[in-house]
Amino acid sequence: MAQLEHIEAIEKRLWSAADTLRANSNYASNEYFLPVMGLVFLRHAYSRFLGVKDAIAANLPTRAGKTRPLTKEDFSQKSAIFLQPQAQFDTLVALPDSADRAKAIIEAMESIEADYENLRGVLPKSEYQELDNAALGELLRTLNPEELKRVSGDVFGRIYEYFLTQFAGEKAHDDGEFFTPVSLVSLIANVIEPGSGTVLDPACGSGGMFVQSARVVERRHENPTEKLTFYGLEKNATTIRLAKMNLAVHGLEGDIQRAITYYDDPHELLHKADYVMANPPFNVDEIDADKVKRDPRLPFGLPGVNKKGKVSNGNYVWISYFYSYLNERGRAGFVMSSQASSAGRDEAAVRRKLVETGDVDIMIAIRSNFFYTRTVPCELWFLNRDRQEALRDKVLMIDARNVYRKVTRKIYDFSPEQEQNLLAIVWLYRGETGRYLDLVAGYCQRMLAEGAACARAKHFSPVPDFIAALATLRGAVEPFLMTLGVGAKNVSPLRELDDAIPLFKADAEAFRKAVSEQQAAWKTQKISNGELKKAVDRLATLAETSRDLVKQCDLLYKLACRLIETCENECNARDSDAWNARDVIRARKAADEARVLAVEQLKQVRYFWKQTNWLTERFPEAELRNVEGLVKLVDRTEIAANDWSLTPGRYVGIAPEE
């Protein structure tokens, strides 16, 4: 199993166990929320502590034969938290049922806060007194499975985010508004691409924008704590605690102040921020107009006032604030209600002034149901105060409402590949052709790797294992078939199965050889657009073959099931001593499990080919072009003719049916 899939499986299993425990303990989500997040934080701190402890200890100086003790500073240099013995997770897990676990956890949290001023008053403590001792013991054990002791990288950071996601879905805190979907935050961060400087989120919630910004820096093999300085504003005290824990769990620090951003600006970053990223509340109508009308963060004026003296809609207050925070080379990316891009009257006047600055860079429309708490569609706005002169009167409009992956019946997101494909459009817009070509080439290589894994993956062999499982199932039925003698030939599913298995084996072997040949050919592949397009066309045959093999897998299993049913229902197999029902059931289950794994692996081949095809069909010359229903580069004249609307769907047209 791939590392990412392995982590996802761990996340789901941990959440399921924790949620089941909550259900069995009669606690509401809002009662269970902070204690669970606090223990996820503590478990991660312990993981990082262990990860660097041995290396630190090996390099400690000695004097008179004595090694200097470990210190907080040793661990800070490694972006890890120093844990006193009482705060180490194994110590807490090992507590007997007779011990007061709540007291022990509180003491663990207090010891961390005593050493780290930025976490003082942040970690959950008294909340643990609300949970009974047995529930705490079970929760500690749940968060400490054996497999988590062997994983590497930022696994607990991911688990922390996953738990935030699930709690947001349950509206466990602040009606879920504290959390912005990771796929939207990631897209914003990767469009802006923070390099170095100040990152401000004036509505920071649980701090996701900071975490994703850090990941962008880490992918360049740079240290985000050296490159970026994080500043946040947030009105909810509990949410600030979540954000500070989120930063700490990723080895980051930030200055997050409690403030109502409409009226307060404690960081005083007017015209000073290098990057602004945010997901503010949508369509707020409670901002006191008198309090903000002279605010220097409103360079385009108030966007309308209602009869109650309130700003009629707060969307353009937020947008104006974001713009005003930027320095002369700053970039902003934020989530906004889809109403804002075409709002009329006073809001349209503000929008016109903003467009006329030449700093509106990119607009991306997102379909509904990306949020756990809002069903409405939204848009991502990108401002850039340091644009190429040739682009200053243009805006890139991307309508991504048809780009999504279904997560649950009600929730959507972007797959990693969908996010990359949208970013590829931005790269072409910026003239970064090399990144686009590298992505296409990467998809081709991934397709071939997935094809090779069909025959032999890291820990198993999906297609050969399925063939072997079928043979075992066929063998489990064979003793009974022998009792039928020549009559076995009249069992229709048997004939079909025995004909289909050799054919599948031959096709699977031919596929394996074809993949091997294409991998050999790839070693001399040129990464030019023309040569890559030829490769995509050449690999189309493999993609179709993998789909055919999927159909064959399903057919073979159906034939095997029909054979069993025919033996039992028409040939009275259950009455025969030669029919071992237990062996047949076991073999049937094993064959189905092997089929699922083989089919999942085979589908990956065509999936990655489809990604290459999606890009090369839409951008055949590896250059940005208008694509109906997806993207259009719009100039200011056209925007003015459309009431200064910044709604992508108004310009890109309707996508043709595929």
Report the location of each language-model feature:
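Short, solvent-exposed loop/turn segments at the edges of secondary structure
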Residues: T225-E226, R374-C378, L391-R392
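Non-catalytic, mostly N-terminal accessory regions of nucleic-acid modification and defense proteins
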Residues: M1-G195, D255-L269, A365-S368, R392-D399, ...
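Short, contiguous acidic/charged loop-to-helix segments that flank catalytic cores in large enzymes
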Residues: N26, I287-N313, S338-E347, R367-T373, ...
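Helical mechanochemical/support elements of P-loop NTPase systems and associated helical scaffolds
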Residues: H6, I10, A28-E31, A135, ...
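Conserved S-adenosyl-L-methionine
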Residues: D174-A278, F282-R294, P299-V305, Y316-V317, ...
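Conserved Class I SAM-dependent methyltransferase catalytic core
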Residues: S29-H44, I188, I240, K244, ...
